[in-house]
Structures are given as structure tokens and as C-alpha cells.
Amino acid sequence: MITIDRLTLSYGRQQVLKDCSLRVEAGSRVALMGPSGCGKTSLINVIAGLLTPDSGKVSVNGKVSYVFQEPALFPWLTAVDNINVVLSDGPETLPRAEQLLEAVGLSDCRDKYPHQLSGGQKQRIAICRALAYGGDILLLDEPLKGLDADTRDQVSALLRKEWAGKTLLLVTHDPSEAESLCDRVYRWQEGTFR
């Protein structure tokens, strides 16, 4: 579960979030929608502990996986190793990483390094790594941006399957993406989400 109570966040004199309160129940799938620059990414960065708000409280109950808007991969690791790095040691780890790569259509990229991959391929690997890491809460910041329609459908199906029954918080501009992955949508309005 995620509870946000009267959160305020500013960048200098510009207030981005104003008395924002939100409750995301365990196991629910929630989308945050709004115009660019309204504070969607800032809010999930606060939830992830990457930003400190000016005031208010955030409570996160559970282990969090986060897929950033821009893929963050280790440049010295291959695609499969970027996934494998979050798995505990054991004989099942490599097959799990390979299974996830296959599920997003990247088996042939197994041994490639991030600099050899397109932006969409990197994003799919970042999603695979978050799924491999597991946890109770998945934060997704524009995860399907830049993917073609077939790949978007493939990745959406994987997210629904792998994250069934767990909490998902999605930031998106795309209503069809929100509809595909979430059962509730909050829209930005005057510094908060309603």
C-alpha cells in the first residue's frame, strides 16, 4: 500500500505538488495522468525515496521495483546480466532472465551491451529487470514510450501476467496505456491528483 498525505514539493519557487494526498491500496493498479511538467514523475520519485518533499508524509508498505522514464542499465553488463544482477544466486536465475527476455522479444539481444541496443530495447530490458527483482509495488514512469504497437501489447500482457495481484503505479500520457494496465486513473488538477 502507498499512502501520501498532504505532500508539497517545490523546485525553487515553483511549487509542483500542493497538498497532494493519495492512497493506493495493496494489489490495485493505478495510473497518474496529466500534462508534461505537472509533477507525475516527481511524485513517484518521492514515493521511491529519490526526492524529499517540502512537507507531508509518504508511507510505502512493501518492496518497490521502479522502471524509470529513461532506461537505466549498467553499461558494462550484457542484456541478460542486467536482468540477472537483481536475481539471487542460484541455478534458476539465468533461465528466469532468459525467459523474461524471450517474453519481450529480445532473446537475440541476450549478449548485447546497452550501447548496442535501441532505446525501446533498453526499456524492455529495464522492465524485465524490475519484474525479475519482484516486490510488492511496481512504479512505472512512461514504460511503453517509444515502443511500436505490437511490442506495447506484448509488454503490457507481460506486465499484467507477472504483476497480477500486486500494486502497480503507472505514470503515462496515454489513456489506452492506462486502460490496458490499470483499474483506476487519477488526473492532475491544480497541483494534486484527483
Put a short name on every predicted segment.
Residues 132-136:
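A short, proline-enriched helix->beta-strand linker immediately N-terminal to the Walker B motif
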Residues 94-109, 159:
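Conserved ABC ATPase "signature" region
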Residues 113-117, 121:
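Conserved ABC ATPase signature
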Residues 33-35:
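The feature captures the beta-strand-to-loop junction immediately N-terminal to the Walker
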Residues 48:
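Helix-to-loop junction immediately C-terminal to a conserved catalytic motif
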Residues 149-151:
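Helix N-cap at the start of a conserved alpha-helix in ABC-type nucleotide-binding domains
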Residues 138-142:
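Catalytic Walker B motif of ABC-type/P-loop ATPase nucleotide-binding domains
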